[in-house]
Structures are given as structure tokens and as C-alpha cells.
Swiss-Prot record:
Subunit structure: Monomer.
Gene Ontology MF term list: 4 iron, 4 sulfur cluster binding; metal ion binding; N6-isopentenyladenosine methylthiotransferase activity
A Pfam family it matches: TRAM
This protein's name: tRNA-2-methylthio-N(6)-dimethylallyladenosine synthase
SUPFAM superfamilies reported in the protein's UniProt record: Radical SAM enzymes
Superkingdom assignment: Bacteria
Organism: Leptothrix cholodnii (strain ATCC 51168 / LMG 8142 / SP-6) (Leptothrix discophora (strain SP-6))
Cofactor-binding details, from the entry: Binds 2 [4Fe-4S] clusters. One cluster is coordinated with 3 cysteines and an exchangeable S-adenosyl-L-methionine.
Family designation: Belongs to the methylthiotransferase family. MiaB subfamily.
Catalytic activity: N(6)-dimethylallyladenosine(37) in tRNA + (sulfur carrier)-SH + AH2 + 2 S-adenosyl-L-methionine = 2-methylsulfanyl-N(6)-dimethylallyladenosine(37) in tRNA + (sulfur carrier)-H + 5'-deoxyadenosine + L-methionine + A + S-adenosyl-L-homocysteine + 2 H(+)
Length: 469
């Protein structure tokens, strides 16, 4: 069995934090994140890079910032246009010398065109070049002109990122970049490049380092996370995703493992079997299906049928009967008929999804689907979306109500968003639970505790701590 080298993790983390990190410069960075959890991870890394290189500290107020970064998403046109709207709102801050940068997938897709549209932007960088941000800003100062770097140096950025700084008991770990599926509607392969997996030992070292700092839950990230194929040490051996999960499962201190986003075509028998052997693997899965019609799935170039998707779910439920399932849907793909939509609604009834991210089809420039003839009115698409979302909401309500009276294991994350005097945490099945932590509330943050569910709301639960003997 392969034995990864993990012993250097505590020393490395300590030396960076205690010895080499620059003193706070007084400068502040504001980062606005759009889109997926991969972007959230990248935003954290931007903050880490600027803290390590220049001593920047984060701020939630752009008016107080010396550097403003927009980490963008190009999956839908609305998200892309919002970036330029937000850029316009901070333009006035240039008068006092604030630096502005645009990163992420819009940056990768548009490149120098962003400077043409918003000439007050100082740097434009892609998902694979965020580690070069300090150098780009320095070059901007030396040359007196905006800098653009949207190249794809594969996985180079991970070799130049400082060790992760922990904020809470849960953390993201990116295990791969890019996508090689080339679905007809999707820009990700063009903005993040082809699939490239981080080395196996490197991922395990990062997770072990997080565990040493008190992290109890890790979410493994990738555009197609279950397509992971990482090189094992100095050998020619390759670890698949199921193997990686096994090794992460054995890291002391890690109590929960999540991952996103997975692809149905990469749901191997070994991955399904992992749900029987790995209790730390949470009882929740996000598995995008996108549509319930085989004809539309073919047009999307998803590579599977509805029956194949349902077969995967059936095998999973044979192992974990109460597994919580969420998914993605695209409504109004070119050529979608009433019958196609009805098939999607039937799939929702058949599976019983806990939640979904659903949107009207947004043609993205440069993708094959953008050239398809689309004769369905926006009003029809909107009505279909509303029907789909209402059905999912009914499912969510019923499933939440069934949890009333049960005891759920909850990782306490911090103050409740509903009431800062209370606490909130997350169940294995990814439900938020709000509760009164009592006089010892501060000591509960970061801990796993049992909560008896007393009330069900549309998108959260309420409960009370259960005292153990």
C-alpha cells in the first residue's frame, strides 16, 4: 500500500505563520466572489497570497479597501454582466489610489477586453494565475499600465500558494482543475482548461495540515471532482477518486468528508462502494443531472441517459437508503418541448431531490449550444422554471418536516445569520440548523454536537442541543 509523506505538515505551517509571514502592512483587500465553491476556494487563496506577500488583511467594506478583487463567474450571462455593474460602483475609489483586479472565469474568457470596457481596472488574471497576483500588481506599478495574465500553466499555482489559513472547523481543498467533458452549453473547459489532478500526496498533506489546525470537515473540490486521477508519490501509480477518499478518511482529526461537483459518468463502482466502507463520507450527494429528457441530454452532450443516472442513484440508495440528494437543472435548452419538460418533472418525482440549483438556459459565446436555434419564448421558459422550483420546494418542505423529532449530528460553524445571539451549524445532509447555545455558546463553535430538531423551515431547521451522559 502506498504510504504518503505527511510528516512535514505541522513544521511547514508553523514556519510560515510564525517566521516568514510579513507583518500587517495596514493595507486591506476586499474580495467579491461570484459563482461556485471552486471560486470561494480561489478567493480564499487570493487573500492568503496577498497576506503572505504584502501583509494585506481582509475587509468586508470596499470603501475601506486598498485593493478590490472581483472573482468572477461566466456560467451565466447575468453573473457576467453583474461584474461590470459592480466594477462601475467602485470606479470612484480610483481617485484615492485603490487598485482594482478582475479574476476568475470572466477574466479568463474576456482577457484584455475587460480593460477596454473598464480601463480603470489594474490587473486581469485567470483561475490558474492567481498566485501571480503580487507580481502583476508590482509590474503594474513599475510599467504604469494594466496587466493581463490569463494563461493556463496547468497546476503550477499550487506550487506557489502559501499554506492555508484556517477560519473555522470546515475547509475547502481543491484536488483538481479544469474539465474535459465539453458539454455543449458550458464554458468551463475554455476558462479553466482541461482536467488536471493535483498529486495524491500533495492533497493529503494539505488535508493533514488543515486537520492539525482544527479542521473537522473538508470539502474536496473540482469541476468534475470524481474524475480525479492523481500521481502517487514518485511512482507511475495513479490514484482514482475512491482511493483518495480512503486515504483522506484515515487522516486523524477529519470527521466529515464532502465533495463537489461530481459527474454521473465518473460515478464508478468503487466510488459507490466507498459509501458502504467510509462512515466519514457524509450522507449527502450533489450529482448534477441537468435534464430529464434523453433527447435534451444528448443535445447537451452529457454522455448518459436518464436510466443510467437513475441506476446510479438506485445503487447508492441500496447502500445509504436515506442519503440526501441535490442536483442541477437547466430549463429551456434549445429545442426543449413540453414533453421534454414533463420528463424532467417526472424525474424529480421519481428521485425526490432535497434541493436543486436551477436556471434558464443562458447561451455562452463560443459554446456549441450558443449556435442552436431556439424558438421557445422566455415566458414559457420562466413558467417551466417556476413549476420545477415549486416542486423542488415541496420536496424540501416534506423532507425537512420528516426530520422534526430526530437527533442530528451538527458541526457548529458560528453565529446564526437569523439571530447573531444564537448559533448555527450544518447536518450531514447539508441542512442548516439554528439553535440557542446557552451560556457556553462560544465553546461550542467548531465542535460536533447532537441537536434534536424541533421546527422545520423552508431552507433551515431549528433545534436544541442534546446533553450526553
Amino acid at each position: 500500500m502506498h504510504t504518503p509523506t505527511l510528516t512535514s505538515t505541522p513544521t511547514t505551517a508553523t514556519s510560515v505563520v510564525d517566521d516568514t509571514a510579513p507583518a500587517a502592512s495596514g493595507k486591506k483587500v476586499y474580495i467579491r466572489t461570484f459563482g461556485c465553491q471552486m471560486n470561494e476556494y480561489d478567493s480564499d487563496k487570493m487573500s492568503d497570497v496577498m497576506a503572505a506577500a504584502e501583509g494585506y488583511t481582509p475587509t468586508d467594506d470596499p470603501e475601506q479597501a486598498d485593493l478590490i478583487l472581483f472573482n468572477t463567474c461566466s456560467v451565466r450571462e447575468k453573473a457576467q454582466e453583474k461584474v461590470f455593474s459592480d466594477l462601475g460602483r467602485v470606479k470612484h475609489l480610483k481617485a484615492r489610489g485603490v487598485l482594482i483586479g478582475v479574476g476568475g472565469c470572466v477574466a479568463s474568457q474576456e482577457g484584455a477586453a475587460i480593460i477596454e470596457r473598464a480601463p480603470y481596472v489594474d490587473v486581469v488574471f485567470g483561475p490558474q494565475t492567481l498566485h501571480r497576483l503580487p507580481q502583476m500588481l508590482a509590474q503594474r506599478a513599475r510599467q504604469g499600465r494594466p496587466q493581463v495574465d490569463i494563461s493556463f500553466p496547468e497546476i503550477e499555482k499550487f506550487d506557489h500558494l502559501p499554506p492555508a489559513k484556517v477560519d473555522g472547523a470546515a475547509a475547502f481543498v481543491s484536488i483538481m482543475e479544469g474539465c474535459s467533458k465539453y458539454c455543449s452549453y458550458c464554458v468551463v473547459p475554455y476558462t479553466r482548461g482541461e482536467e488536471f489532478s493535483r498529486p495524491f500526496d500533495e492533497v493529503l498533506t494539505e488535508v493533514a495540515g488543515l486537520a492539525d489546525q482544527g479542521v473537522k470537515e473538508v470539502t474536496l473540490l473540482g469541476q468534475n471532482v470524481n474524475a480525479y486521477r492523481g500521481r502517487m508519490g514518485d511512482t507511475s501509480d495513479i490514484a482514482d477518486f475512491a482511493t483518495l477518499l480512503e486515504y483522506v478518511h484515515e487522516i486523524p482529526g477529519i470527521e466529515r468528508i464532502r465533495y463537489t461537483t461530481s459527474h454521473p459518468n465518473e460515478f464508478t463502482p468503487a466510488l459507490i462502494e466507498a459509501y458502504a466502507r467510509l462512515p466519514k463520507l457524509v450522507n449527502h450527494l450533489h450529482l448534477p443531472v441537468q435534464h430529464g429528457s434523453d433527447r435534451i441530454l444528448s443535445g447537451m452532450k452529457r454522455g448518459y441517459t436518464v436510466l443510467e443516472y437513475k441506476s446510479t442513484i438506485r445503487k447508492l440508495r441500496a447502500i445509504r437508503p436515506d442519503i440526501s440528494l441535490s442536483t442541477d437543472f437547466i430549463v429551456g435548452f434549445p429545442g426543449e418541448t413540453d414533453d421534454d419538460h414533463a420528463r424532467t418533472m417526472k424525474l424529480i418525482d421519481d428521485i425526490g431531490f432535497d434541493a436543486s440549483f436551477s436556471f434558464i438556459f443562458s447561451p455562452r459565446p463560443g459554446t456549441p449550444a450558443a449556435a442552436l436555434h431556439d424558438d421557445t419564448s422566455y415566458e414559457v421558459k420562466l413558467a417551466r422554471l417556476q413549476q420545477l422550483q415549486a416542486t423542488i420546494e415541496d420536496n424540501v418542505r416534506r423532507i425537512s418536516e420528516r426530520r422534526v423529532g430526530t437527533v442530528q449530528r451538527v458541526l457548529v460553524e458560528g453565529p446564526s445569520r437569523r439571530d447573531p445571539n444564537e448559533l448555527m451549524g450544518r447536518t450531514e445532509c447539508n441542512r442548516i440548523v439554528n439553535f440557542d447555545g446557552g451560556p457556553n455558546a462560544a465553546r461550542l463553535v467548531g465542535r460536533m454536537i447532537d441537536i434534536r430538531i424541533t421546527l422545520a423551515y423552508p431552507h433551515s431547521l431549528r433545534g436544541e442541543p442534546v446533553l450526553r451522559d
